[in-house]
Amino acid sequence: MFKTSYNLYDLNYPKNDSLTPIRDYKNDYFHKNDDKLPEIVRKPTRKLSKHENKLNDKKFTNKRPASLDLHSIVESLSNKKIYSPINTEIFQNVVRLNLSPQIPNSPHEGCKFYKIVQEFYLSEVEYYNNLLTANNVYRKALNSDPRFKNKLVKLDSSDELLLFGNIDTIASISKILVTAIKDLLLAKQRGKMLDANEWQKIFTKNEVQQQLYSTFDISEAFEQHLLRIKSTYTSYFVSHQKQMELFTTLRMNKNHFFNKWYEYCLKESGCIKLEDILKSPMKRLTQWIDTLETLESCYEDILSPELGLKLSPTRRKYSLFSNKLETEVSEYKSNSMYNFSLTPSEIIQSYDEDQFTHLLKPPDKQNKNICNASRQESNLDNSRVPSLLSGSSSYYSDVSGLEIVTNTSTASAEMINLKMDEETEFFTLADHISKFKKVMKGLLELKKNLLKNDLSGIIDISLRRINAWKKVIECERPSGAFFAHDNLISTMCSSYIDKLHEQKNQVTILKLTELETDVMNPLERIIAHCTTVKSKLKDLQALKKDYMLFLQEKKANVRDIKRDLLGMHFQNLQNQMKRELPVFITLIHDTIECILLNYIKVFLKYLEIIAGGKKYLQKDLENMSLNDSIATGQIKNLDILQCYSKSRYMTKRMVRKDWPFPGDPSGSRVVRKLFEL
């Protein structure tokens, strides 16, 4: 007899992988009027002990089933109505209790999967080493070798940064991926090398594959890699076209130095071409997607279902990223002025930012602190200049030239505030007054020169000349072959005069509208404010004598209310001028900068008008591009030279053969000078 509180069934409790059903499964579980429906099972708030679980389940184990035939369980459960009180999903899971994970029966089943992993691992290592070659061989020779230094591109220039882009960052990210896969394969055994022997163990040993079955989460490594490459590869993809254009330009324009540098680097790198390295990131994304697709097709029985099913979402994420890259590259090509390195908030902020604030350099006195600030400002001004090809000037071609101007503008604004603080601390009121007088004198001189500048002067000179020539042409002359084309010439003169009058009208409108509104009116307002400040300075100078008397009386303990009021007024006015005059001078510099920029815009429009308008400028550009497309050695403005030579030849022939006046034309000194007889 057993001395225990458990009955015999409790001692003989079935093991986990067997099933003890509560009744015969071939009969209905319940009927419509059944009064023995199961109670709602509530989850306990605490973990029950093993003994309590057995006691709770005892009522289900007392009645043994009539049959233990379990073949029709799945079919009967699938035919069960959906509103059945039995949780069929849980019951189906109970049928397959704690099945042991299916692992490769032989190492050959996992060999194909890990062969693919090996190929990808070795290709990623090769990709990483090739990227390092671009920096350690090509870039190093370009910067360090005296034979090539500053010959092709300048050190740390934007052209150099565009040529090599952010390859070093891409290489470091690939190294992280290689390290992650290595740690997964070696079960994070530090210091161990993934050599040929380790690969052979992975291919042949069943124990190693069983260990990797539930630990080799390669999809997680790819997921982390995708997070790292998004911004880096986006920047590289959108600048790749300009990168290759710069490479071609250097090869064409600096052929001698380029060939020497390229030949030397080919020998050092083992004949790895730079253009192949630069194109490799563009192809690598497709290779990652293909690798994930191949791994997804053969992971069964090699990885656990939890790890294997993660490969498909990872591959879809890479495909979406690839499509997004193609879209952004196409948008970048269609709108080259768009800067992909800026965030939306930075783009919105840049609308109101002045790109030329870094040009502001207000005059100041020479002192130690100001010199230091000037040196810092000069260092900012000597920063990298944006490339014409790249449109970008960041270290990784990830930040555009616009962003450098913005950063320089911010730094310059901070430098101005620093100067204002130093001026307040070290400069006296007399220094500020002296500077203000110079500034006001310069403003008056600027206004005088702008008023003196007659924009219509060039057109008036052209009108006087063409009118004089027209009078010469239309003077009374005898009929003859020499004057056969006089009507045509007269018509051309008239049309040219009409064109000049139209240009003069456009210039007059430009002068009365944009020049007056954007340049002259703001300048006059600044001068008016300066006049107000100048009057206050005169008041300050007039009160100075009374203030001196006030100080003397105060020292002698003599009180005069009038003197006291004048003295206090002088002190307040003096403090106000010392506090506000430096700020006002800085505002003058800011305003004058905007005025000059507006004047430049107006002057560019003026040049466009006197050049003949946009149509003529467009024709000139087309002619220039046509001349550039023709072989080198083509003479510029050949059409003008040909027209001039033809006209001169025809005129000389008319003078020699069809001279309508009496006498030999070579006998006249004027005719000989004009027509080189």
UniProtKB/Swiss-Prot annotation:
Residues annotated as domain DH: 112-326
InterPro entries linked: AH/BAR_dom_sf, DBL_dom_sf, DH_dom, Dynamin-Rho_GEF
Keywords: Phosphoprotein
UniProt keyword Aminoacyl-tRNA synthetase, yes or no: no
Spans traversing the lipid bilayer: none
Phosphoserine modified-residue sites: 67, 72, 84, 100, 106
Coiled coil spans: none
Matching PROSITE patterns: DH_2
Entry protein name: Nuclear fusion protein FUS2
Species name: Saccharomyces cerevisiae (strain ATCC 204508 / S288c) (Baker's yeast)
Lineage: Eukaryota, Fungi, Dikarya, Ascomycota, Saccharomycotina
